[in-house]
Amino acid sequence: MSIKGIGINADSSRIDGNLEVLREDLACFQRAGFDYVEIPVHGVDAILNGRLNPRQVKRVKEVLARFDLQYTVHCSDWLNLMDADEFPLHKSNFEASIEFASEIGAKILVYHSGRVELENEYLGQAALTRELLSLPDRALVSEQERRERETLAELADFAKERGVTICVENADPRVDEEALWELARRVRVKGIDLFYRIAPGGDIALYNYGGMISRLVEQVKGVGKENVGITFDFGHAYIASHYYGFDFLDSIELARPFIKHVHVHDDFGRPAGVDRRQIVLISQGKGDLHMPIGWGEIPYREVFSRLKGYEGVVLLELKPRYRPYLEEALQETRRLLAECGVE
């Protein structure tokens, strides 16, 4: 068997609801030789207050139909089934995302793994019942993970009727939130101490299970649906492996039976801090840079060698600033896939 093809992401911030920009980008992607394009449901304004926007969806479909391309869909980056404050809205957004994927003939729908947002804990409704620098306890996090599993199982049935597979994407570390979490834990355990370093510790990635591939695998296993798998984002996993201290290549092997979609891009394995501006991060080699492969340090020869037998889409997820290098990036990806026996 062979891969379905090589794709590229349509950038949500670049499109920002402007379908003329989408049209221009699709024309560019087709000229470059891509087979698939990943459409961000939030970038094309397909959902309005948790419901499909039929007027806009009609216009989107008219644009997509002009091109000899196939499509996958990315849910809103904001979508989070572990957000207790806004759960009904997140669920309805997810249902609308499935409907959108079905409308445009996409078989794959990417969803970022859920997380307990620390800013919600301190600034949202939950903050009214929490002490300063208290932590959401393990029971609360476990309950939100359980609800996400049950909801994904329910949504999987809805998606199956429409020919859609849900692919849960692994996360990269959010160092600013990790530091807040760890500081709160240490204050509770040790009291105020200004001389210890903030670093991953006791409750490592508790609030954000998708950063740990082993926990993501367990979550997807727990859903127990054939059409719920993993989007393995190699860039995210490479950063997370350095930050959390797990073996990057071993994590691919662990997730391999559940991988139904992949995101391919490069970085240096160093997490960003609070300042996530690309103009700052690029020169420092930090953060989720979304560069073409070969620009960073991810060992893609070893990565692709572990994808033999993979039958999905290989999706390049690049920042718009790398547009001049699209054809080069596509050719390099094809070459390396072929050398590794993944074609």
Role assignments for model-derived ranges:
Residues 1-107, 118, 124, 142, ...:
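N-terminal pre-domain/capping segments
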Residues 38-39, 72-75, 107-113, 166-169, ...:
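Short beta-strand segments at enzyme active-site cores
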Residues 20, 66, 83-229:
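Active-site acidic/histidine proton-transfer and metal-coordination neighborhood
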Residues 1-5, 10, 19-30, 105-107, ...:
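Histidine-acidic metal/acid-base catalytic patches
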Residues 12-14, 41-43, 77-79, 113-117, ...:
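Active-site-proximal loop/turn and secondary-structure-junction residues that shape catalytic pockets
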Residues 56-73, 147-159, 223, 295-303:
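Alpha-helix-loop-beta-strand connector modules within alpha/beta enzyme cores
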